[in-house]
């Protein structure tokens, strides 16, 4: 379960990106946050994964508060696909980019290869594993980023863009 209590965040003293935001997402529940450009949707996503820290309020995963001390533990439970998937590509090909998170979690190579093929296939990118990310369309990049997150089998997946679905 995710619980957000009275969250505030500002990029400047005059301009609140978020003010007094509270919500709860139970296990197996989906939450969609909709709004105009600049309404704080990406800010909420970044707060939920600990990229930004709340200036007021709190975020809990089950009974664990997201803090500097717990952020690494919680990040292992949460995956995010950003609005611009280019920010998630680190390698020379699609296969490497799907594998990146798995390598960080020390998944054995034999298991990693199976997961790469399984999730690339699930998103229709199995024929693109050796392609360079910069040669892909925006939608293909989204699918590669989603495959990488799904392969991690996280408890929570945050899609910071309507077209990430």
Q: Which residues fall in each region the model found?
A:
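A short, flexible loop at the N-terminus of ABC-type nucleotide-binding domains that lies
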Residues: 1-4, 8-20, 68-70, 109
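The feature captures the beta-strand-to-loop junction immediately N-terminal to the Walker
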Residues: 34-36
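Helix-to-loop junction immediately C-terminal to a conserved catalytic motif
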Residues: 49
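Conserved ABC transporter NBD signature motif
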Residues: 57-65, 74
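Conserved ABC ATPase "signature" region
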Residues: 110-128
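Conserved ABC ATPase signature
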Residues: 132-136, 140
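Catalytic Walker B motif of ABC-type/P-loop ATPase nucleotide-binding domains
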Residues: 157-160
């Amino acid at each position: 379960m995710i619980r957000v209590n009275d969250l505030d965040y500002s990029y400047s003293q005059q301009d609140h990106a978020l003010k007094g935001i509270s919500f709860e997402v139970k296990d197996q529940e989906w939450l969609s946050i909709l709004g105009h450009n600049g309404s704080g949707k990406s800010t909420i996503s970044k707060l939920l994964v600990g990229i930004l820290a709340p200036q007021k309020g709190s975020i809990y995963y089950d009974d664990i508060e997201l803090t500097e001390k717990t952020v690494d533990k919680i990040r292992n439970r949460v995956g995010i696909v950003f609005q611009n998937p280019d920010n998630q590509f680190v390698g020379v090909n699609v296969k490497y980019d799907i594998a990146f998170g798995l390598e960080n979690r020390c998944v054995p190579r034999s298991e990693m290869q199976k997961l790469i093929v399984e999730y690339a296939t699930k998103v229709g990118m199995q024929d693109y594993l050796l392609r360079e990310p910069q040669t892909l369309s925006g939608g293909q990049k989204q699918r590669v980023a989603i495959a990488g997150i799904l392969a991690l089998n996280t408890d929570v997946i945050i899609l910071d863009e309507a077209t990430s679905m």
